[in-house]
Amino acid sequence: MCGVKRSCNITAPTFFLSAAEHSGDALGAALIEALRGEFPEARFTGIGGARMAQAGCRVLADPTRNSAMLLGAAAQAGYWFKLLSGMKKQWATEKPDVIIPIDSPTVNLRIARLGRRLRIPVCYYVAPQLWAWAPWRIKTLRAAVDTLCCVLPFEQAYFGQQGVPTVYVGHPLFDLPANRPQTDPNMLKPPLPKAPVRLALLPGSRQAEIAANFPPMLETFLALRGKFPGIAAVAAAADEDRAWQIRNFLPRYGAKIEVRTGATDAIIRWADLVLTCSGTATLQIARHHKPMLVLYRLAWWKWNLVGRFLVQSKYLCLVNILADRDLVPEFMPFYGAVEPLVTAATDLLAHPEKRQAIERQLAELTAPMAAWSEAMPAAQRVALEAARLMALQ
């Protein structure tokens, strides 16, 4: 079933990877290394960022610099239309052996559907969270993939019941030990502040997320300074562009906090409490067994006119979804004053025993996921699944 100029060469295949965000770019880079372990002569092309390029991918476009969420993504329709049109022309004459879209369903489901129409195997990595919102898109997903590689334990059963070919590969966050030297806060240069009370701020990796969520985080920190003398805060940035954006907020609030890039795990381990944007970061924090407050600021009208009709899950925080209970406080959608955040943070910072109870529960929650990844990393499982699909052609 080889197409035009498609070699179907099992020893030197061509893989097309698509990552639209920083998190997907990191997953793509790790996956390239795993695929190269299976196919040393493989070629890699696709859509992604600097990390995929460094791993050896010929990057055709880098959308990670302006990635957006929900309604923000619609504003980029022209960009993606042009990119998809170019891919369609290229694949009509030179097809990759396997397409691997990574997360970002708004974009990647379109890429997957295009691949299936051209009879190119599609191995989708990181399942769209249709169990939480927009479950009616399951029909589109079912028609767009040959295999769906899920990263959360319950997803295999959910998507399997919907008729989607699914494998559970484990979550890539657990592929490396949490307490390795690279995540040790004492190893950072310059060192993090030595403060009696320590607050980590994780406002997200997208420009729109930071613009929405960092101001209430800053306001919460400023309010906590009056309750906890000597409190220090450190913000984690995905890259220098996001660090620059975060630092630009500080003069407006008269706040002095450190902003670090490439040190998120160490900052989490350093902190007593983490204020975080919703998303995968909550699982990253849980992996280190750290108490957290989770928020996502959204305009009132966006939630009431759009958001509440899309969301189907009882909880919005990934940690609470996995636990199926209110394990960590979540403030989503958040569109009011910061007093509830300040109250919740004060309660946890003033009561170490409450933080310790959360730490124990997070350890119990994440232990099975860590054990699964210890047996075989997620990237390697995805690589083996991609190889299986290719062998069927």
What are the residue ranges of the model-derived segments?
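Nucleotide-activated sugar donor-binding and catalytic core shared by glycosyltransferases
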Residues: 2-393
